[in-house]
Amino acid sequence: MKQYAVQTKFNGTIVVSAIDEFNAEELVIEVIASDDEIISVQELDM
């Protein structure tokens, strides 16, 4: 598992643990509002 900082338009930055970037995006999509969108995904150094 890696840590990813996922920046969204309305909710700011959400940090999630995921196996890869795609999985991190999927996890965030489940919790943000339907009108929100992901701006960037960045892997955090441990």
Placement of each model-derived feature along the sequence:
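Short aromatic-glycine-(Arg/Gly/Cys) micro-motifs in beta-strand/loop hairpins
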Residues: 1-12
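A short, exposed loop/beta-hairpin motif centered on an aromatic-Gly-Thr core
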Residues: 11-20
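A general, composition-driven signal for non-globular sequence regions
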Residues: 1-3, 19, 36
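Short, mixed-charge low-complexity intrinsically disordered segments
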Residues: 30-46
